[in-house]
């Protein structure tokens, strides 16, 4: 008699286990790597991605591309997550980390198919990663922070390496200098929020500028603003979160009046409340008034008559950056506008940039903030420029905090590959094969750099292996001359932190995917999702 089958899972649940599902997961990760493979390095190509709403994005950044791809495969999502975490943590190396993770999996795939236990693979990978990280720390070159000129040179080289694979690589020297200037203006915490990036269409890339202070787009203004002065020297700046306009009552207010005089008294009281606020602001000595909330036409004309400048509906982020630069604090009431709460700057002016008008605060006493104003043609191009600058800024921040650098262009990967290959020959058993596979996987970076530039990858990798075997630690791919070169001498530098982070994240992701022995897909997530989406809409009561 047949035993009754026990049904644990809901009908329609898709469950796959054993070696076939693990191989399937590894193959899914290869597909993700294929999507970003060609974007690596200075000769990398760009991707044009159009989302569901028809918005086009041109990008070369691994994390941006993977975010825009709607990945549904659960194992492949792991690679998307490590690219995002690399972007958040160090800013650059997002394509490298995805390629490394996929290549690690590709190298262990034959061992998995032969039935090697995943735990043996994981143990070997953890050993190899630890050895590789220690080796990077050992050979990384430290630049002394005391020597400001040397440190600045190092930071510019790191920024140029980060920008060399981007759309704006032709202007990398121009932007690298701007990026280093920007990060140097920040305080010791190096808060990214304190660097504003504003995009103005039109003009050439070289028209982009860095403002040592705050700049933001002119807000919507009411009639009367054209009478206000557009430039002040040493003004006091009032930063408010107060509405300065007459408005209908927000709540259900009810006023009962019996005579015309009663009504007039109410109207007068409303006007008096507004004028009282305006007078207090005027008497505080402030010449520039910024508010997060609207400043109406009456207030605009009142300030114009008294040679004051005002701007309402200023974005909160810009208001906070103005406060950080000019000092003072944001007030929610006008009753205590003393000198302590007002900000100051040397020059405030409103300037035309392209087709837009911008408000500039420069010469700020606490200038721990700055603003990039980017110029350029197409909107997508400027968005990609912003992403490229973000990567370069993150790299420079990392280089300031961790002042050790390694050579890029596949040099560090080749050195680690040689080191791990040599190490693997000293140990017996399966670990030897697996650490050898890890070492081979590291060669994907220089190989892909060659492929993307159209070089003969096999030939160049043979030269690199030979040179590293002779002790040429920093030899990597020379993109300009289709050969190998000492990339440290060529100033292809990047913070050691970027490589350490990429290796550990890629190795962890590979271990995570190898350690999964069963994939269970719940049917609810696929069947019920579209139905649930329409549920929240009100359909009105049937009459």
Swiss-Prot record:
PTM annotation (Omega-N-methylarginine): residues: 535
Crosslink (Glycyl lysine isopeptide (Lys-Gly) (interchain with G-Cter in SUMO2)) position: 430
Keyword terms of this UniProt record: Acetylation, ATP-binding, Chaperone, Cytoplasm, Hydrolase, Isopeptide bond, Magnesium, Metal-binding, Methylation, Nucleotide-binding, Ubl conjugation
GO molecular function: ATP binding; ATP hydrolysis activity; ATP-dependent protein folding chaperone; unfolded protein binding
Superkingdom, natural source: Eukaryota
The keyword Phosphoprotein is assigned to this record: no
Protein location: Cytoplasm
Sequence positions that bind Mg(2+): 92
Catalytic reaction equation(s): ATP + H2O = ADP + phosphate + H(+)
Complex and partners: Component of the chaperonin-containing T-complex (TRiC), a hexadecamer composed of two identical back-to-back stacked rings enclosing a protein folding chamber. Each ring is made up of eight different subunits: TCP1/CCT1, CCT2, CCT3, CCT4, CCT5, CCT6A/CCT6, CCT7, CCT8. Interacts with PACRG. Interacts with DLEC1.
Role played: Component of the chaperonin-containing T-complex (TRiC), a molecular chaperone complex that assists the folding of actin, tubulin and other proteins upon ATP hydrolysis. The TRiC complex mediates the folding of WRAP53/TCAB1, thereby regulating telomere maintenance.
Name of the protein: T-complex protein 1 subunit eta
Organism field: Pongo abelii (Sumatran orangutan)
Source organism phylogeny: Eukaryota, Metazoa, Chordata, Craniata, Vertebrata
Gene that this sequence comes from: CCT7
